[in-house]
């Protein structure tokens, strides 16, 4: 059964839209945990467009589940992670003009650089996950880097047409199996919603789904705790086949 990591970046987005102090993502993380979140995920971007350094520092002190820090593969971010010591670091690609992360890391092209960073972090007791597309060559690169986890990019599945989704779901299923055969542990995320999460949650070997925007959007209507409860229920009892998205049973 997959667990749920709640990404609270979009709470910080609301705050930063007015350059004010509310809503504060730190107490919101507590509400997410009360709603059943198995972990809290934040992305500290180089441009600090939403999550700020003080958020990460305070979340490290207050999160009672797991704190997953998403970050670019830079010396600055590695230094922050080594100081804060989150429960996991997920290295992600980052571009200044993007609205959100647009694809997976090119681990093959960046293997030497990533290997050094993975070693630094894991030597300090911080497990590292690499955010990648479900492609065998990239998964092999993850293994070569020394990383113990991958997070599969679900964007093509989540944003695909009705006709494309079964194919993209099959890629995620095959990618999960391939990664596990290589000794990697598997998370997934990007663009998952209440409407499309169940087939991904049902993939054998899937350990955690990191989900943010849809939960925060739902929270506007029902509150954050209830929004998390509803997503957790879908993940714990997925009702659709992981290959074809059809109802189970």
Swiss-Prot record:
The family this protein is said to belong to: Belongs to the PNP synthase family.
Function, in words: Catalyzes the complicated ring closure reaction between the two acyclic compounds 1-deoxy-D-xylulose-5-phosphate (DXP) and 3-amino-2-oxopropyl phosphate (1-amino-acetone-3-phosphate or AAP) to form pyridoxine 5'-phosphate (PNP) and inorganic phosphate.
Protein name: Pyridoxine 5'-phosphate synthase
GO CC term, one of those recorded: cytosol
Pathway: Cofactor biosynthesis; pyridoxine 5'-phosphate biosynthesis; pyridoxine 5'-phosphate from D-erythrose 4-phosphate: step 5/5
Record has Signal as a keyword: no
Quaternary structure, from the entry: Homooctamer; tetramer of dimers.
Substrates-to-products reaction catalysed: 3-amino-2-oxopropyl phosphate + 1-deoxy-D-xylulose 5-phosphate = pyridoxine 5'-phosphate + phosphate + 2 H2O + H(+)
UniProt-listed GO biological process terms: pyridoxine biosynthetic process
Keyword set, alphabetical order: Cytoplasm, Pyridoxine biosynthesis, Transferase
């Amino acid at each position: 059964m997959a667990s749920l990591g709640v990404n609270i970046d979009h709470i910080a987005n609301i705050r930063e839209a007015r350059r004010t102090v509310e809503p504060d993502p730190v107490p919101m993380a507590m509400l997410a945990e009360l709603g059943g979140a198995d972990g809290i995920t934040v992305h500290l971007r180089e441009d600090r467009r939403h999550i700020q350094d003080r958020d990460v520092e305070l979340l490290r002190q207050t999160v009672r589940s797991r704190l997953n820090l998403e970050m670019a593969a830079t010396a600055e971010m590695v230094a922050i992670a080594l100081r804060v010591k989150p429960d996991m670091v997920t290295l992600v690609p980052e571009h200044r003009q993007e609205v959100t992360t647009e694809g997976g890391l090119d681990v093959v092209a960046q293997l030497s650089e990533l290997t050094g960073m993975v070693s630094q972090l894991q030597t300090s007791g911080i497990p590292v996950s690499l955010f990648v597309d479900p492609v065998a060559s990239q998964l092999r690169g993850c293994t070569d880097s020394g990383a113990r986890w991958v997070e599969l990019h679900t964007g093509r599945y989540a944003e695909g047409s009705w006709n494309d989704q079964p194919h993209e779901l099959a890629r995620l299923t095959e990618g999960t199996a391939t990664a596990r055969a290589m000794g990697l542990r598997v998370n997934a995320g990007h663009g998952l919603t209440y409407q499309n999460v169940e087939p991904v949650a049902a993939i054998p070997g899937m350990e955690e789904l990191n989900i943010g925007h849809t939960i925060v959007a739902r929270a506007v209507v029902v509150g954050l705790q209830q929004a998390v409860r509803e997503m957790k229920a879908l993940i714990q009892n997925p009702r659709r086949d992981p290959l074809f998205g059809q109802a189970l049973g």
